[in-house]
Amino acid sequence: MNVSVTKRRKKKKKKKSEKEKDKYLDEDERRRRKEEKKRKREKEQCDSEGETEVFESIRKDIEATDRPVRTCRTHPENESTPLQQLLEYFLRQLQRKDPNGFFAFPVTDQIAPGYFMIIKNPMDFSTMKEKISQDEYKSVTEFKADFKLMCDNAMTYNRPETVYYKLAKKLLHTGFKMMSKAALLGNEVTTTEEPIPEIIMPTAAEVVKKSKKPSKDMFRVMEEDQSSIFEPEGNACSLTDSTAEEHVLALVEHAADEARDKLNQYFPNCRIGYLKKNTDGTLFYTVVNGDPDNEEDTHLVDLSSLSSKLLPSFTTLGFKEDRRHKVTFLNSTGTALSLQNNTLFTNLKPDQIELMYAGYGDDTGIQCALSLQEFVKDSGSFAKRMVNDLLDQITGGDHSRTIYQIKQMTGSEREGCSNSVLDFMTLKSYSDVSLDMSMLSSLDKVKKELEHEDSHLNLDDASKLLPDFHDVHNDRGGSRPSSSSSMSNNSERDHHLGSPSRISVGEQQDIHDPYEFLQSPETDNQN
């Protein structure tokens, strides 16, 4: 401490003595001494710079001999594609518009709470830079899509009055204008009112160190439209009519590029377009995904382009049936064949079966309903009511409506049958439809004898006959029809049950319908 203090005092004394001496010197002498001091300082500075240059050269030689060359930095520079160089150039220009680094790195929950609950696909400049280095971008459109996603995320999470929202909106407008087709091709017309800023060219040291300078051809294209790349920040954010139109145009061009890339990716050889009608009535077809280098591809739409030429002697086009959509006849529940093969509803008619299907949906629903009703058949009324309520809840009330309609239909049929008198002699006209009518003559004799005799029905014999009739009816409904439709299918058991000795019906009103054990001519013909 004492040494430094003494040195300072000596310097002050020396300066005072020099100033006192300069008081008595002329102006020429003072100028000469100043020049000598200046030359002395320059000489000392040159000597120090020379020593540092020699030291740096020696150190580089030592590092070059002792340390191997790191090829990992020079390797990507040699293999980087022109597209990568262009995207790196765009990324650097966009990062300059973000001086505070809001979009430089990924957003975390500590910085923005609940960010990942709102934003499902985050994006930032570092992620885009990594994708460029890994050559994941196949076109400028994909790069623009990620850039738009980053700005949209910021405008979605933040409010319009925040700094982040305003910067994202400004950055989106600037970036799309910079990456527009007109800016890439150098066809955008710049106005004289907007000042063109100076282009700061990177030095040679920066090129060697960072390896981020674009190629000469690409930079030549970029220099043709400097205003679109280096846009002043004030004009970029002002949403006047002209800038708003440019912003919308850039968004439309970006959407069109995305659509064209998707079409070329999924449908490489397709030609998609739209129809446009002119004022004179002509119709044109414009291709959307044509070659961008060529002019707009349009075609005139008329009858000759839609069909072949008309023959001279014909005034109408020939009709050709399309066999690809031919309608075939379906086997529905209302057909006689399905009724004969149906073993579940042998005692129901087609309209009743249609009601069942309308109420329960399909065979599974009908079987489920029948199973539940069979389960509580021997139970009390409370269990049956519960099952009916359950089926109403499942079918939405269709169960009760279906049962009510079927009961109405069966009741009306019974009233009609009780009031009608069956004439057996009218069945003789069906002798030519493969029915065995030999028993009808005997039935006529039995009927005449019963009119004269006042006998009573043996109830025991009738109760024995009913199960036999029911078995025969089930066998006929569930058996497969015979292939020989012209022959009678009546068996010995049928003849035995239908013989006059077994039928002692008398004058009773509860006579069974003969159709229960006689084969119908309609079903026989359909089989």
UniProtKB/Swiss-Prot annotation:
InterPro entries: Bromodomain (IPR001487), Bromodomain-like_sf (IPR036427), Bromodomain_contain_prot (IPR051831), Bromodomain_CS (IPR018359), DUF3512 (IPR021900)
Described function: Plays a role in chromatin remodeling and regulation of transcription. Acts as a chromatin reader that recognizes and binds acylated histones: binds histones that are acetylated and/or butyrylated.
Region named Histone H4K5ac H4K8ac and histone H4K5bu H4K8bu binding: 156-158
GO biological process terms held by the UniProt record: chromatin organization; regulation of transcription by RNA polymerase II
GO cellular component: nucleus
Designated name of the protein: Bromodomain-containing protein 9
Free-text comment on this protein's domains from its UniProt entry: The Bromo domain mediates interaction with histones that have acetylated lysine residues at specific positions. Also recognizes and binds histones that are butyrylated.
Domain Bromo: residue ranges: 78-182
Residue numbers spanned by region Disordered: 1-54, 468-527
Keyword vocabulary terms for this entry: Bromodomain, Chromatin regulator, Nucleus, Transcription, Transcription regulation
Organism: Xenopus laevis
Disulfide bonds: none
SUPFAM superfamilies: Bromodomain
Compartment annotation: Nucleus
Matches recorded under Pfam families: Bromodomain, DUF3512
